[in-house]
């Protein structure tokens, strides 16, 4: 760690922007205070970017943990799908990393009008700027689940409104849940298949 600052701000997104304004590195990410980066991830990401200079954005699988750091679930994702991003955000934020060059290309800031869906908005802006994504077959982050987290308490009001605003912008309307499910169903099938393959390999001592 090369710096630390604690002061009043205008919300989480503003605070993240303040932090990024002080950075100089070529690989960028943020981590929320509840969540964790899994051991070995940073060196793995640095090596991957060095070996794949044409990739702009990467993310990976997540584990879910409780307040005692006990693992309570997993997200094992299929290959990246740009089209699905118009309908929903499937990228685990705590596993997301990108190059500074693509950050600067999209303006070098998160949109501070978002309190909840700033990461989804950011992903869409990256996609629309031509960013090349890669989903990496590795558990890279841990997402903490507890009753008082912002994700749980506000998704029913502010979060839902922000997500609908993004969908309206991208597809021209606010779709029904049925329409969303129909649009993302092929991805969900791939998700289930990828999860099954992982469990089979893991059962035989060969997880990827």
Task: Give the positions of each predicted feature.
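Conserved donor NDP-sugar-binding/catalytic core segment of glycosyltransferases
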Residues: 40-72
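Short glycine/serine/threonine-enriched helix-capping/active-site loop
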Residues: 7, 57-62, 136, 143
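Membrane-proximal basic amphipathic "stem/tether" segments
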Residues: 168-208
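Glycine-rich, basic loop-to-helix element that forms the pyrophosphate-binding segment
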Residues: 7-23
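Short aromatic/hydrophobic "clamp" motif used to bind/position activated sugar donors
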Residues: 28
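Conserved nucleotide-sugar donor-binding catalytic segment
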Residues: 76-166
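The conserved acidic donor/metal-binding loop of glycosyltransferases
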Residues: 32-36, 61
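Conserved donor sugar-nucleotide recognition element shared by glycan-biosynthetic enzymes
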Residues: 12-16, 41, 94
């Amino acid at each position: 760690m090369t710096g630390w600052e604690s002061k009043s701000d205008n919300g989480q997104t503003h605070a993240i922007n303040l932090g990024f304004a002080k950075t100089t590195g070529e690989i960028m990410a943020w981590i929320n205070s509840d969540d964790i980066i899994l051991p070995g991830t940073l060196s793995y990401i640095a090596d991957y970017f060095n070996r794949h200079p044409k990739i702009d954005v990467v993310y990976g699988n997540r584990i879910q943990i409780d307040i005692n750091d006990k693992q309570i679930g997993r997200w094992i994702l299929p290959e990246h799908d740009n089209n699905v991003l118009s309908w929903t955000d499937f990228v685990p934020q705590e596993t997301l990393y990108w190059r500074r060059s693509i950050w600067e290309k999209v303006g070098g800031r998160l949109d501070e009008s978002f309190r909840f869906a700033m990461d989804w908005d950011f992903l869409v802006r990256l996609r629309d700027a031509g960013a090349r994504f890669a989903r990496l077959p590795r558990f890279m982050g841990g997402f903490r689940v507890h009753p008082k987290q912002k994700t749980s308490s506000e998704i029913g009001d502010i979060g839902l409104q922000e997500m609908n605003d993004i969908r309206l912008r991208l597809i021209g309307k606010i779709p029904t849940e049925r329409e969303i499910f129909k649009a993302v169903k092929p991805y969900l099938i791939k998700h289930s298949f990828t999860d099954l393959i992982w469990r089979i390999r893991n059962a035989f001592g060969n997880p990827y």
